Amino acid sequence: MATPASITNVTVEFLQFPALVTPPGSTKSYFLGGAGVRGLNIQEEFVKFTGIGVYLEDKAVSSLAAKWKGKSAAELLDSLDFYRDIIKGPFEKLIRGSKLRTLDGREYVRKVSENCVAHMQSVGTYSDEEEKAIEEFRNAFKDQNFPPGSTVFYKQSPTGTLGQLIFSKDETIPEHEHAVIDNKPLSEAVLETMIGEIPVSPALKESLATRFHQFFKELEANPNIEN
């Protein structure tokens, strides 16, 4: 992967996203691909709700570099295919969504699931199985309330498990998952709605492009870096 010097922390409002995270009970670390704010324009004011960070398995850099090295940060930012390669890439992802203001679990998951359903319908991947998965997804959040600083973690496998939906009172990763949902279209849709064609966090997309451009440059300069 990229050298440790290039994998820096990111601050989003009062939230700190460390360069590396290691879940409890695991020997595997994930590096921070990028982080940014999610918000909405409400009555001509941009209201910030969440800070989102995307962590990836080590081999993500070399996997993506095969196609994207040599591109500028601006070229990466303008390429939907780059983000789709992150979304569909053969490496694990750990997504952290930490709240900047209090959010009710039902209201939060209603909007997230609506965005996911809209995407899956637009690309023709929404069927009875996905409808069931969406219901599981909504049920996982129904009794939750998220005060500022609390976090939802989504751990995604290359096989499509949106698993290990993990809820935390702060930024630490609890040892036990809250729910596991085995549905690849939904798993991909969750990240698609964050960084895809209609992203809820343009700032996260920009962060990913800027940081991966640097990762690729370092990989080219140091081709013997382990992945």
From Swiss-Prot:
Sorted UniProt keywords: Flavonoid biosynthesis, Isomerase
Note: Part of the biosynthetic pathway for all classes of flavonoids, a large class of secondary plant metabolites, many of which are brightly colored.
Catalysed reactions listed for this entry: a chalcone = a flavanone
One term of GO molecular function: chalcone isomerase activity
Pfam families hit by this protein: Chalcone (PF02431)
Superkingdom in the source lineage: Eukaryota
Principal EC category: isomerase
Identification of the protein by name: Chalcone--flavanone isomerase 2-B
Residues at which substrate binds: T50, N115, T193
Stretch forming the signal peptide: none
Functional summary from the UniProt entry: Catalyzes the intramolecular cyclization of bicyclic chalcones into tricyclic (S)-flavanones. Responsible for the isomerization of 4,2',4',6'-tetrahydroxychalcone (also termed chalcone) into naringenin.
Enzyme nomenclature, EC number: 5.5.1.6
Involved pathway(s): Secondary metabolite biosynthesis; flavonoid biosynthesis
Annotated site residue numbers, Important for catalytic activity: Y108
GO biological process, any: flavonoid biosynthetic process
Record family assignment: Belongs to the chalcone isomerase family.
